[in-house]
């Protein structure tokens, strides 16, 4: 698996919930949960990239390798590129540090898709839902996908809109995007050298930069997992999820 590296960007100065990756869930920090899932996938080297010595020190306590990156990184993708740009790997997985419920099989599935399809630049994962509360939540990013799972758009808005509620349209799920990206190394380099795009700045979704530049993103489908952690409310929901599962 020497052609693949998994990088977990873990920012101490996160905007909505500072130091969220250090918050405890079921006796382990959020970032440790993510790291353990990455190690269990067995798909290559696992590295944590952070701007904080506090996180580096914390990661050492549970045996993870962490590297310091610049505080000037504008996004998690910039951070992972700084960590891997001089490496020899052909495939780079960006596994966001606030996804404590990510499953090893999801990681394996994204990497498998990335390696088998020569036409795609980025692989990711989505899950179907019929839950209106999730669909209408701007923190749950919606994906519009073609029949062959190519991404047409990502949005915080409730899309696609069902203009008529028929028996047929009721059976059509919405797709929620998960915080995992597999990049071909060449695509990652191309991405970080692009300026932020107009749609990206409107939605605050960096994957739109790739779409606007014509890059091909495809997704695997997975079962819904527990929540990603963006806010204090999400953290409370995550703790409830652990108690109930």
From Swiss-Prot:
<dbReference type="GO" id="GO:0005829">
    <property type="term" value="C:cytosol"/>
</dbReference>
<comment type="similarity">
    <text>Belongs to the KdsB family.</text>
</comment>
<keyword id="KW-0548">Nucleotidyltransferase</keyword>
<keyword id="KW-0963">Cytoplasm</keyword>
<comment type="function">
    <text>Activates KDO (a required 8-carbon sugar) for incorporation into bacterial lipopolysaccharide in Gram-negative bacteria.</text>
</comment>
<dbReference type="GO" id="GO:0008690">
    <property type="term" value="F:3-deoxy-manno-octulosonate cytidylyltransferase activity"/>
</dbReference>
<dbReference type="InterPro" id="IPR003329">
    <property type="entry name" value="Cytidylyl_trans"/>
</dbReference>
<dbReference type="Pfam" id="PF02348">
    <property type="entry name" value="CTP_transf_3"/>
</dbReference>
<comment type="pathway">
    <text>Nucleotide-sugar biosynthesis; CMP-3-deoxy-D-manno-octulosonate biosynthesis; CMP-3-deoxy-D-manno-octulosonate from 3-deoxy-D-manno-octulosonate and CTP: step 1/1.</text>
</comment>
<dbReference type="InterPro" id="IPR004528">
    <property type="entry name" value="KdsB"/>
</dbReference>
<dbReference type="GO" id="GO:0033468">
    <property type="term" value="P:CMP-keto-3-deoxy-D-manno-octulosonic acid biosynthetic process"/>
</dbReference>
<dbReference type="GO" id="GO:0009103">
    <property type="term" value="P:lipopolysaccharide biosynthetic process"/>
</dbReference>
<keyword id="KW-0808">Transferase</keyword>
<dbReference type="InterPro" id="IPR029044">
    <property type="entry name" value="Nucleotide-diphossugar_trans"/>
</dbReference>
<comment type="pathway">
    <text>Bacterial outer membrane biogenesis; lipopolysaccharide biosynthesis.</text>
</comment>
<keyword id="KW-0448">Lipopolysaccharide biosynthesis</keyword>
<protein>
    <recommendedName>
        <fullName>3-deoxy-manno-octulosonate cytidylyltransferase</fullName>
        <ecNumber>2.7.7.38</ecNumber>
    </recommendedName>
</protein>
């Amino acid at each position: 698996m020497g052609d693949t590296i998994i990088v977990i960007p873990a920012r101490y100065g996160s905007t909505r919930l500072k130091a969220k990756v250090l918050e405890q869930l079921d006796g382990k920090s959020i970032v440790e949960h993510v790291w353990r899932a990455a190690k269990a996938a067995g798909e290559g080297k696992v590295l944590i990239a952070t701007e904080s010595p506090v996180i580096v020190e914390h990661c050492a306590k549970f045996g993870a390798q962490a590297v310091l990156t610049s505080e000037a990184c504008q996004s998690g993708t910039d951070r992972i590129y700084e960590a891997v740009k001089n490496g020899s790997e052909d495939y780079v997985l960006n596994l966001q540090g606030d996804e404590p419920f990510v499953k090893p099989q999801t990681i394996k599935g994204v990497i498998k898709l990335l390696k088998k399809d020569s036409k795609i630049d980025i692989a990711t994962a989505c899950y179907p839902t019929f839950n209106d509360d999730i669909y209408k939540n701007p923190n749950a990013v919606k994906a519009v996908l073609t029949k062959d799972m190519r991404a047409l758009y990502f949005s915080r808005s409730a899309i696609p809109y069902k203009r008529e509620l028929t028996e047929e349209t009721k059976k059509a799920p919405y797709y929620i995007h998960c915080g995992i990206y597999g990049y071909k190394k060449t695509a990652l380099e191309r991405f970080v050298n692009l300026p932020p795009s107009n749609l990206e700045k409107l939605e605050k979704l960096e994957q739109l930069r790739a779409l606007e530049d014509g890059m091909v993103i495809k997704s695997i489908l997975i079962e819904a997992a527990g929540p990603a952690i963006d806010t204090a409310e999400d953290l409370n929901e995550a703790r409830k999820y652990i108690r109930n599962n």
